[in-house]
């Protein structure tokens, strides 16, 4: 099987020769710098895939901010306090992505040949208003500025549909993620009622178009997503990543409760400095879920710089072994 056939078969819960081997989140700069000192011959992401024997993929993030969008005063602070501010920054939002879409031509051809999957990211309906309001003001806005929240998300949904229409003329990615980060170690950052009122209507506008294009929709949300998974299904979302182990996520529990759920990630990055025995034990923990289909084991977030080059070589060697074993 080629890379695209294998990924699609896995996500359809069909038999395959082996599971995909991907690093869904590119490595930290500090990690690459360490590995270069330890003998890594390249810092190029795609050459690193080949060097480590990982399956290639290509990701394109279609962000809704133009290059002219003003920088916030500090991390976590936003540029929008109310409707007037939104009107001021709106001319710097929702740019066309003509150049990025044109750049997909070679990726689309490589995907057609089965050489790697194409993945796109769109900003989600929790994530995007947070970038405008700032972290604290965003959480108050659900109660204090509901009309503005709805306007932002309707504008965003309209924008996503325009981007998808233009992109589909060039490339139809294998899967996509909505960047959200709407959960933390204790669960969701919003209630089911808030999700239903402020996010669900806009997912229901965009997700059916993804289905028409045969693009598998995932949510990218850190922390413990477990309680949210049924909410996601209600709006047509099919998968979740990265399923952070340190936040308390358990893929076995999720699989038992949600046999339909596609999952990427969940390999506990904290074991990667503890030697081969600990890394193998983590794969043994995941193996029963790997055998159920619909699950790509991958580091549950970017590989941290505490992991040596030899540690990572050990990890990818075990990944190769267990991706064969899971398909037996």
For every predicted segment, state its role:
Residues 1-39, 90-328:
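Active-site loop segments of alpha/beta catalytic cores
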Residues 20-23, 71-81:
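Short, compositionally biased low-complexity segments
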Residues 41-63, 170-171:
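Catalytic domains of carbohydrate-active enzymes, especially glycoside hydrolases
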Residues 48, 68, 95-99:
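Amphipathic, low-complexity, repeat-rich surface-exposed segments
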Residues 57, 74-77, 258:
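Glycine/serine-rich loop-strand microenvironments at binding/catalytic pocket rims
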Residues 61-71, 121-126:
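Short, glycine/charge-rich beta-strand/loop segments that flank catalytic centers
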Residues 66, 82, 315:
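Catalytic cores of transferase enzymes with a strong primary signal for eukaryotic protein kinases
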Residues 78-91:
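Active-site gating loops and adjacent loop-to-helix segments of metal-dependent hydrolytic enzymes
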């Amino acid at each position: 099987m080629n890379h695209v056939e294998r990924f699609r078969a896995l996500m359809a819960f069909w038999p395959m020769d082996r599971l995909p081997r991907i690093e869904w989140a590119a490595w930290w700069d500090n990690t690459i710098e360490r590995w270069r000192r330890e003998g890594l011959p390249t810092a190029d992401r795609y050459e690193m895939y080949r060097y480590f024997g990982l399956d290639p993929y290509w990701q394109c993030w279609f962000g809704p901010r133009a290059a002219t969008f003003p920088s916030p005063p500090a991390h976590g602070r936003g540029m929008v306090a109310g409707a007037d501010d939104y009107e001021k920054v709106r001319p710097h939002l929702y740019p066309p992505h003509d150049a990025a879409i044109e750049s997909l031509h070679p990726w689309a051809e490589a995907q057609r040949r089965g050489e790697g999957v194409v993945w796109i990211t769109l900003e989600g309906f929790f994530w995007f208003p947070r970038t405008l309001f700032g972290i604290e003001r965003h959480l108050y806005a659900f109660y204090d500025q509901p009309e503005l929240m709805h306007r932002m998300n309707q504008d965003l949904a309209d924008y996503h549909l325009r981007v998808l229409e233009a992109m589909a003329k060039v490339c139809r990615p294998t899967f996509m993620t909505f960047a959200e980060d709407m959960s933390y170690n204790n669960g969701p950052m919003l209630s089911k009622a808030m999700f239903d009122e402020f996010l669900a209507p806009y997912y229901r506008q965009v997700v059916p178009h993804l289905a028409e294009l045969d693009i598998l929709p995932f949510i990218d949300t850190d922390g413990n997503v477990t309680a949210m998974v049924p909410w996601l299904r209600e709006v047509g979302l099919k998968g979740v990543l990265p399923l952070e182990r340190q936040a308390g996520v358990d893929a076995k529990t999720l699989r038992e409760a949600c046999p339909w759920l596609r999952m990427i990630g969940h390999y506990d990055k904290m074991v990667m400095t503890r030697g081969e025995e600990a890394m193998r034990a983590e794969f043994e923990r995941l193996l029963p879920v790997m055998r159920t289909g619909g699950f790509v084991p991958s580091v549950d977030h970017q590989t941290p710089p505490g992991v040596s080059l030899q540690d990572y070589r050990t990890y990818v060697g075990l990944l190769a072994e267990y991706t064969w074993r899971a398909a037996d």
